[in-house]
């Protein structure tokens, strides 16, 4: 299965520090160039699972490692969707070497469960942690900081 079919890819647009437009599943970055690759590198032997995970995390402000039938994963995705925040989803049960990626995530985060959620390159936890950060008003500022950082890096280039 291709990366595009296995993951939802969203657009990222930034204007005055506010995230605009785009919905989960929409392809392309509308010229923003902010890590919306639809290339199929998942499972290629030349790159280790950890390297592939790290590349995905560094190229996207929000990454959710999920399983398609997981209710906690759905809850986490809904939080970002309801905040109109775009995110990349990697459905581990739909990629060829999903169990190897889940093992790599375990080594990186200390947990085998899904979802495993990264914001601004930082592991923030699972669904309960994401819900708590959202209720405390801390989740959206983390996302905004990522978009600001990416915008600054793009200006420097």
Swiss-Prot record:
Record GO terms (molecular function): 2 iron, 2 sulfur cluster binding; metal ion binding; protein-disulfide reductase activity
UniProt cross-references to InterPro entries, sorted A to Z: Glutaredoxin, Glutaredoxin_euk/vir, Glutaredoxin_subgr, Thioredoxin-like_sf
Binding-site residues, [2Fe-2S] cluster: 61, 146
Protein name as it appears in the record: Glutaredoxin-2, mitochondrial
Annotated GO biological process: cellular response to superoxide
Quaternary structure and interacting proteins, as annotated: Monomer; active form. Homodimer; inactive form. The homodimer is probably linked by 1 2Fe-2S cluster.
Transit peptide: 1-19
Domain Glutaredoxin positions: 50-150
Family according to the record: Belongs to the glutaredoxin family.
Cysteine disulfide links: 70-73
GO CC annotations on file: dendrite; mitochondrial matrix; mitochondrion; neuronal cell body; nucleus
Organism encoding this protein: Rattus norvegicus (Rat)
């Amino acid at each position: 299965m291709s990366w595009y079919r296995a993951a939802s890819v969203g657009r990222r647009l930034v204007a005055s520090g506010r995230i605009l437009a785009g919905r989960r599943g929409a392809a392309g970055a509308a010229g923003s160039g902010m890590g919306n690759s639809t290339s199929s590198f998942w499972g290629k032997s030349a790159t280790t699972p950890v390297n592939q995970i790290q590349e995905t995390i560094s190229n996207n402000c929000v990454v959710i490692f999920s399983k398609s039938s997981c209710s906690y994963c759905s809850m986490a995705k809904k939080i970002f969707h309801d905040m109109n925040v775009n995110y990349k989803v990697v459905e581990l049960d739909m990629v060829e070497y999903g169990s190897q990626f889940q093992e790599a995530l375990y080594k990186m985060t200390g947990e085998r469960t899904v979802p495993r959620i990264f914001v601004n390159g930082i592991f923030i936890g699972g669904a309960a942690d994401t819900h708590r950060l959202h209720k405390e008003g801390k989740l959206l500022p983390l996302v905004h900081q990522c978009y600001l950082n990416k915008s600054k890096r793009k200006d420097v280039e």
